[in-house]
């Protein structure tokens, strides 16, 4: 059985980990980092870049550099208006009100689903793991925010499938963090709160640990709140101040906006350890009078003032989670901070003041979720023993009933996997079919909740209203993904639905995208081979020119002409990037040089032999003259 990897697919950064020798290990990527930026870019020639290389070129290519794609996963276009305003790339409405990202590849406009972009990030993490392990990787545990709904979880699973990964489990991020924190504390009984504030989402989960059982008691959160929002407050503040001074709105220039975004993110990070920082962006824009520079000092106090209301938004979910878990603040033994945004001092103070205790900072907030995912992967593969994970569904699940009311079948914070059935009936006489409208959310009215799908059960025998008995069954698997069926008890006729994600991706579309991803991987390999071949040709051209300068005058004229002809051909083929002829041009030049080298070697040998013969002749002709000498007797010497 191959290794199952653990992946934290984050809004800002992603991490991959694996169990090795019974211990979870974060895998270092080809760039030498433990975290991979969740960024995908498309260059002018259509080459996709993922991770640090994509992030590095974002300033010069803002419209084709995609980041924070997690905020669009499994969402309708109408739900992401705030997110769209925060990114410089183009987000358009797709079929059925879905989200599509528009990029320009090789002069052509192309639409990508959020799942396809996420799949590119997952492919990079998959390749990182394969290079480290030395074997193919086909299975993974992928984490999601605890408050992700059914559609968002399905979209994440689809992204994994497109990337060529069988997703063995969709795991809630706070649960993964608790798993990583509590693995060596299995013999203790603890009640812990996991406060997870990442780049784009916020979760709070209350768990009980004891005897190797990790039981989630309640979860709450906000999938529209994270570090991106803090960055945006800084961006708006800096842009507004600059506009007051110069009369120019930098947000209207995609390149300036991207520079501003990077500067805001950097300032936010610096203000976690420093009391003030300076944003310095030379040549940020230009007018008829010349270039304009942006230099602005920002204090921690100002930053905290800008984000105070956002941090305050994390308090009501904490209160609700404690209420749902039927616990008081004093009952919590440990508060674990997860996600890069928890490094912000105001966030830490808010959490510590709420719970009345110091937060536990023993875990790395960037890596702990991936480590937990790797542990869960170890549980699934049998590598980790004596660990039982009991997670919950974050939101109410139910159906629409008479009067547009949502009738709940599975309440929020129910332990999963679970199955629940309930009997419903018809609303009018002689009704032969019923529409089952499946909903997710915590509001009373159906219209205020998230629609997961509709299906029709027909063939019901005509009868007065209230007589037919229709059994509706909700089945949630361990990934938190829902399956619904309806059965007429009189006829036994059944209709079921596997709720499709709001992304609208069918199994056929997922397979097409997976095939496309495989093709892109093959294209990437081919492109890499071509670049290596160009580099080989480049080196050969350089070495040949160097050798001709040094030894050219020692070569026979015909051989030198042959080398120069082959060299010119290779230069032309290299310049034209003619890959069909590159191999033969390299071989031709190598052969010409080898033939000339043999002649040169023989000439040097012959020259060496002549030198040797000349030396011998000189010795034979008495070239050594005897010196005159006188014998001195030792006694005579003493006398002298």
Curated annotation (Swiss-Prot):
Pfam families the record matches: HSP70 (PF00012)
Q: Which portions of the chain have biased composition (kind: Acidic residues)?
A: 629-640
A Gene Ontology MF term for this entry? unfolded protein binding
Question: Is Transferase included in the keywords of this UniProt record?
Answer: no
Check the record and name the Gene3D superfamilies matching this protein.
Answer: 1.20.1270.10, 3.30.420.40, Actin, Chain A, domain 4 (3.90.640.10), Substrate Binding Domain Of DNAk, Chain A, domain 1 (2.60.34.10)
* UniProt KW keywords: ATP-binding, Chaperone, Nucleotide-binding, Phosphoprotein, Stress response
Q: Which residues carry this modification: Phosphothreonine?
A: 201
Know the name of this protein? Chaperone protein DnaK
């Amino acid at each position: 059985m191959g290794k199952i990897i653990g992946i934290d697919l984050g809004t800002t950064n992603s991490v991959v980990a694996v169990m090795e020798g019974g211990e979870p290990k974060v895998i270092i990527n080809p760039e030498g980092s433990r975290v991979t930026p969740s960024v995908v870019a498309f260059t002018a020639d259509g080459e996709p870049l993922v991770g640090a290389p994509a992030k590095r070129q974002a300033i010069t290519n803002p419209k084709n550099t995609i980041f924070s794609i997690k905020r669009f996963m499994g969402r309708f276009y109408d739900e992401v208006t705030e997110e769209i305003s925060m990114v410089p790339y183009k987000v358009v409405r797709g079929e059925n009100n879905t989200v599509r990202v528009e990029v320009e590849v090789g002069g052509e406009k192309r639409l990508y689903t959020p799942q396809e972009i996420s799949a590119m990030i997952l492919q990079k993490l998959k390749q990182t793991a394969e290079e480290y392990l030395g074997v193919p990787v086909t299975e993974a545990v992928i984490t999601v925010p605890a408050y992700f709904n059914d559609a968002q979880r399905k979209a994440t699973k689809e992204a994994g499938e497109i990337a060529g990964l069988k997703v063995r489990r969709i795991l809630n991020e706070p649960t993964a963090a608790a798993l990583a924190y509590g693995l060596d504390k299995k013999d203790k009984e603890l009640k812990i709160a996991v406060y997870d504030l990442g780049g784009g989402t916020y979760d709070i989960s209350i768990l009980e640990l004891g005897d190797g059982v990790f039981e989630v008691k309640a979860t709450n959160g906000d999938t529209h709140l994270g570090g991106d929002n803090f960055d945006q407050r800084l961006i708006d503040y800096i842009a507004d101040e600059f506009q007051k001074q110069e009369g120019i709105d930098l947000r209207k220039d995609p390149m300036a906006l991207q520079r501003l975004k990077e500067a805001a993110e950097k300032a936010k990070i610096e203000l976690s350890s420093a009391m003030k920082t300076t944003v310095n962006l030379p040549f940020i824009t230009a007018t008829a009078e010349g270039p304009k520079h942006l230099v602005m000092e920002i204090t921690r106090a100002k930053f905290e003032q800008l984000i105070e209301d956002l941090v305050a938004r994390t308090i009501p979910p904490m209160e609700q989670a404690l209420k749902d878990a039927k616990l008081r603040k004093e009952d919590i033994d440990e508060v674990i901070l997860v996600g890069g945004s928890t490094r912000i001092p105001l966030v830490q103070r808010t959490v510590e003041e709420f719970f009345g205790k110091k937060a536990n900072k023993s875990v790395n907030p960037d890596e702990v979720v991936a480590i937990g995912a790797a542990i869960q992967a170890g549980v699934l593969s049998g590598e980790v023993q004596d660990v039982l994970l009991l997670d919950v569904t974050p939101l109410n699940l139910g159906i629409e009933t008479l009067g547009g009311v949502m009738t709940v079948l599975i309440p929020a914070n129910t332990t999963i996997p679970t199955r629940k059935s309930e009997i419903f009936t018809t609303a009018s006489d002689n009704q032969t079919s019923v529409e089952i409208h499946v909903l997710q959310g915590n509001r009373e009215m159906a219209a205020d909740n998230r629609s997961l799908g509709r299906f029709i059960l027909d063939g019901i025998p005509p009868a007065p209203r209230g007589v037919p008995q229709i059994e509706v069954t909700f089945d949630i698997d361990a990934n938190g993904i829902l399956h619904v069926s309806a059965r007429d008890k009189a006829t036994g006729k059944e209709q079921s639905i596997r709720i499709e994600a709001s992304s609208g991706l069918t199994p056929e579309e997922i397979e097409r995208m997976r095939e496309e991803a495989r093709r892109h991987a093959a294209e990437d390999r081919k492109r890499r081979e071509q670049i290596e071949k160009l580099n080989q040709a480049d080196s050969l051209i350089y070495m040949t020119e160097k050798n001709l300068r040094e030894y050219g005058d020692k070569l026979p004229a015909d051989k030198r002409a042959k080398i120069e002809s082959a060299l010119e051909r290779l230069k032309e083929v290299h310049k034209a990037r003619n890959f069909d002829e590159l191999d033969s041009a390299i071989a031709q030049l190598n052969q010409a040089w080898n033939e000339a080298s043999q002649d040169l070697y023989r000439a040097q040998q012959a020259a060496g032999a002549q030198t040797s013969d000349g030396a011998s002749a000189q010795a034979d002709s008495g070239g050594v003259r005897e010196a005159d000498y006188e014998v001195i007797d030792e006694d005579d010497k003493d006398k002298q």
